[in-house]
């Protein structure tokens, strides 16, 4: 008798991988549309570049490994990986940046460990961290959101900036944001201002903030929240990791905010800034690299929320989502080992 050996998780819900990945990609659409509305067509161009590169890279690796190409490409996992990476990088980043990140995510992080179901780390976040460490200037040059940008960025301008076409030789002109500096995200601005001795209230007076939230970023996170709730409704993901992240981040931020509101932002600011909601529902919930038991998923999510807060508040990077997810990925086997449900029998009476 022949037995088929497959990768974990071994619990089947009757939904094919391609269907799950397609639903995840579809639920990203609200966030993609809002992100494009506020930050221009660069996000869509980066998305197309990442998807094309990811599929091409996966096809080449599958051919080299002697694996079926078309069947594997149809599982849509490369689509989700490419989308998450593209949505995490600046819209006007040079074209080669997303190409390098996509190839690294697919070839090194995913297929070097055996392909889908065998990778230890989230491919999109691993690709993002490699780009952030290798090219920090390009990875932190965001455009100003619509409404406060000195220069609007239409589709043609975005293409010129991304592909370095025309006399501008890149996107420096289009990256000019508020106060004559290259665009700083709300998290960047808060961290910089606090290091200069300003209070959060003084920082919130800047044009990049709309009240207590960053212009554009609140709505982007709200859109990803809406897409994430649909994923929960469709039972594509379970609630444990998402709740763990949000609860831990809320509790940690609440302590800091209550103790010193002049030097700590509110929990809701943490929730609706940077890539929080994208990570909460679309990145951290990757079943391959996360903990598997319900209690383990809660611990896994809580660890991500705590790490996000610690790095954002005390670390050198303003948005810590990628680092938090990768560190939690490292701990997932440890969590699964010590937080295992009692499958058979019961605890003996003392």
Curated annotation (Swiss-Prot):
It holds the Pfam family NQR2_RnfD_RnfE. Its cofactor is FMN. One of its GO terms (cellular component) is plasma membrane. The keyword tRNA processing does not apply. Its EC number is 7.-.-.-. Keywords: Cell inner membrane, Cell membrane, Electron transport, Flavoprotein, FMN, Membrane, Phosphoprotein, Translocase, Transmembrane, Transmembrane helix, Transport. InterPro entries: NqrB/RnfD, RnfD_bac. One of its GO terms (biological process) is electron transport chain. The modification FMN phosphoryl threonine is found at residue 185. It is a multi-pass membrane protein. The chain crosses the membrane at residues 25-45, 89-109, 124-144, 212-232, 239-259, 265-285, 298-318, 319-339. It is found in: Cell inner membrane. The keyword Methyltransferase does not apply. Part of a membrane-bound complex that couples electron transfer with translocation of ions across the membrane. PANTHER family: ELECTRON TRANSPORT COMPLEX PROTEIN RNFD, ION-TRANSLOCATING OXIDOREDUCTASE COMPLEX SUBUNIT D. Belongs to the NqrB/RnfD family. HAMAP family: RsxD_RnfD. The complex is composed of six subunits: RnfA, RnfB, RnfC, RnfD, RnfE and RnfG. This is Ion-translocating oxidoreductase complex subunit D. The gene is rnfD.
């Amino acid at each position: 008798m022949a037995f088929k050996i497959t990768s974990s998780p071994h619990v089947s819900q009757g939904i094919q991988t391609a269907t799950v990945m397609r639903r995840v990609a579809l639920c990203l659409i609200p966030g993609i549309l809002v992100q494009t509305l506020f930050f221009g067509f660069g996000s869509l161009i980066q998305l197309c570049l990442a998807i094309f590169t990811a599929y091409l890279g996966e096809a080449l690796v599958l051919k080299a490994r002697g694996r079926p190409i078309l069947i594997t490409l149809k599982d849509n996992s490369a689509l989700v990986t490419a989308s998450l990476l593209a949505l995490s990088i600046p819209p006007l980043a040079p074209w080669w940046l997303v190409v390098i990140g996509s190839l690294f995510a697919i070839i090194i992080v995913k297929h070097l460990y055996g392909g889908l179901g065998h990778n230890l780390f989230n491919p999109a976040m691993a690709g993002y961290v490699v780009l952030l460490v290798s090219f920090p200037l390009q990875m932190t040059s965001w455009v100003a959101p619509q409404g406060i940008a000195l220069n609007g960025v239409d589709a043609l301008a975005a293409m010129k900036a991304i592909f370095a076409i025309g006399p501008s030789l890149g996107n420096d002109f289009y990256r000019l944001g508020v106060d004559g500096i290259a665009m700083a995200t709300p998290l960047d601005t808060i961290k910089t201002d606090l290091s200069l001795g300003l209070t959060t209230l003084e920082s919130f007076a800047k044009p990049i903030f709309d009240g207590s939230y960053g212009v554009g970023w609140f709505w982007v996170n709200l859109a990803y929240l809406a897409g994430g709730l649909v994923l929960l409704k469709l039972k594509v993901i379970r609630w444990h990791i998402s709740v763990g992240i949000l609860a831990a981040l809320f509790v940690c931020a609440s302590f800091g905010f209550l103790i010193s509101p002049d030097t700590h932002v509110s929990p809701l600011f943490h929730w609706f800034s940077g890539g929080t909601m994208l990570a909460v529902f679309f990145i951290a919930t990757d079943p391959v690299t996360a903990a598997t038991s319900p209690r383990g998923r809660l611990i896994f999510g809580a660890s991500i929320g705590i790490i996000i807060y610690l790095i954002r508040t005390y670390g050198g990077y303003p948005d810590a989502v990628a680092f938090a997810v990768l560190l939690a990925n490292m701990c997932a086997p440890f969590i699964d080992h010590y937080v295992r449900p009692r499958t058979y029998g019961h605890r003996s009476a003392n």
